[in-house]
């Protein structure tokens, strides 16, 4: 009998996303003692929450059908020529960067570079980004990106609060010339912290003694270029710090903030080759003085050496970060915008200092020509000095001019009923300027002569603020200006790294699953990429349909009643969720409720976020099995019942198990007046099996860059939407362009909107059945690894049935005691086997947390398990003295090609060092550096490009 012929393509993508084949799945189930995936699921999910799933989605579409569906949605967006500006500008993404970086899985599927030996390529690109920012802003220390300009401004405000010597002040000055969306996010961030944001015109500012800090815009949002030198001195005289939000392209021509007194510079790198994307994702930047480096938010790439003394890069000063300092961290930000920072970095590498300056001069000269022509037409710009933006007093003609422009498919900036604005960019041409003149000209007026004006117009930048210092003198910005050279440079960097295109990345709590090509394709479509976030609503009908449908999909997956897609990272989702809880309590007159219970096992973002939301953290204990100690929770909830605001709990737990008592935990908190925040970091084990909104959660954030297939990008972008029950829906993030105006947590109404198509595609192709199977296979793969390795490494935590959820924790502490081999040694040795290490020492020191996801095949799981078992054999050889306790393959891992061909003095063979298993002979990853010296890097901090001689040595 022949196989049944399928006449439909429904659900065919499921098998592309799921790793194990049917026969492998059955064999793995038998290893665990089950005969079906349903039986395994039934055994893992606690009785108390079975039946809570409300997932009711149609069958999955084929890849071709889903692409056709989303193309139809995208076509509803109208692409007008946009001159709105306000922090967002049209730009050209150079084709070699688009093809070799943005569309290259070697770049977009990588994880945050916590393992430096396998991350040297993107670390170098990020160091280039830091050098770019430091050079342009005139401040010596820059981080490796933040989420967007508005949240960077909020980070600058809290940074100033920590460091200002005006300790009694709770007031922060923000110029009324800042971008409006920045001011909105500042207000959101300030209120829970008891900070008052005073918005005023700095040109009319008198006494400044009441402020601990200030934020100024350079050039101003309306186009003005102000000289802030005297004002900066006044603020410093009052012991206040000065932050400046600066336009990077303008800084190629203007005096950098660091040279006129700024303590901090922040802004967006969007116009360096990153599409508008309806508001994101874009890389923000943050730079400061050397004295303040230990208080910087975000990640910082620094130069160190490996064990051979060779230059190597790493993430520096990690003790500032939330996963270590928890509620005392400088920020709650984890994932930032690495992929976008790398695009901006390579944009600068490709154009170089001369190319960037030419672009800036062209933009400015066209703006000056436009302004002079408008003056001839009777419209004078309000600005005496400007870079690329103009404000025009158009009086009673304002509405008609907007209408005339839109009739020509052009958007101008709406300011008020008497004024409008224009911002030019690198895509503006002579013909575009002439069209603008035609729109503004009254009937019968002769249009200006472009050629004549181009020959006569003068610069409209203030002479006193023209840049004198050189930019981007490092050779990396002066070499790769042909496409051939840039293509090979990007390939060289990519070859240094390990990403999902080469190997499984089994990081616990990170869900490094497949980012399917069909999911990624719409991201680079112009219909999604070239829309301004503040374009008139009727032009974004496609995005509106996309977000409406995606919100409904996520409600179905979680059991919540409403979704906000605005938070542009998981950390911001946490923050938005706690703000919703806080606002809910305040609306009921319960302002005194400010205690947040957090289990001791929680990720460091939880306490850091609670602190940002104005809550006091009370830690609850965990029992010997890693579960929340319910009696301790009950006692603390009762003790603080009058002040209890919330609990933040991760489910399945951070320890990788489905806690049996989750319903009871939720009930205890509710009975004592609190709300339940369920961290959705581990949602990949629950979709289709149980729903947090149905077993006690009031709010959760979701990591679309984990469960729902947005790639990690080497450390961003991420998306962290929140789902809420109906009583919290009125308190979700708002925006000036939404029905609720207050509570914006990022600059754009839909955050990182242009990558939302990835999640839409994933859900649409998987359908309800596929999403459930993804959860089931994630659980199967984790338990298969756990079972294969348990006789070699103790599995630290399991549920009452001896099973784990979607990840497992291996306890290496006994090995450390018996052999001296540390978790770090095992992690580095895995590199010699071609693997990225699992999560190290989280949530328990001395352990490895492994999450294989549903996308990995049994063959890859076995390859990983075989590597771990082989490593255990090497450890036994250390234990019994066969291998030297100090000079062995683990202590010296990873091994480089240069070491292998050099003088060999180790008591073990070269073959054992680099070919410990036969499969490596045909497919070997060579780390570019040996083990990196972390202590050296922090003691000798260098966070900009070192000399060219260092590169030649590398």
Curated annotation (Swiss-Prot):
Keyword Iron-sulfur: no
Keyword Oxidoreductase: yes
InterPro entries: GcvP, GDC-P_C, GDC-P_N, GDC_P, PyrdxlP-dep_Trfase, PyrdxlP-dep_Trfase_major, PyrdxlP-dep_Trfase_small
Pfam families per record: GcvP2_C, GDC-P
Highest taxon, organism lineage: Bacteria
Gene Ontology biological-process entries: glycine decarboxylation via glycine cleavage system
Essential cofactor(s): pyridoxal 5'-phosphate
Keywords per UniProt: Oxidoreductase, Pyridoxal phosphate
Catalysis performed (reactions): N(6)-[(R)-lipoyl]-L-lysyl-[glycine-cleavage complex H protein] + glycine + H(+) = N(6)-[(R)-S(8)-aminomethyldihydrolipoyl]-L-lysyl-[glycine-cleavage complex H protein] + CO2
Subunit architecture: The glycine cleavage system is composed of four proteins: P, T, L and H.
Protein name as catalogued: Glycine dehydrogenase (decarboxylating)
Native organism: Pseudomonas syringae pv. tomato (strain ATCC BAA-871 / DC3000)
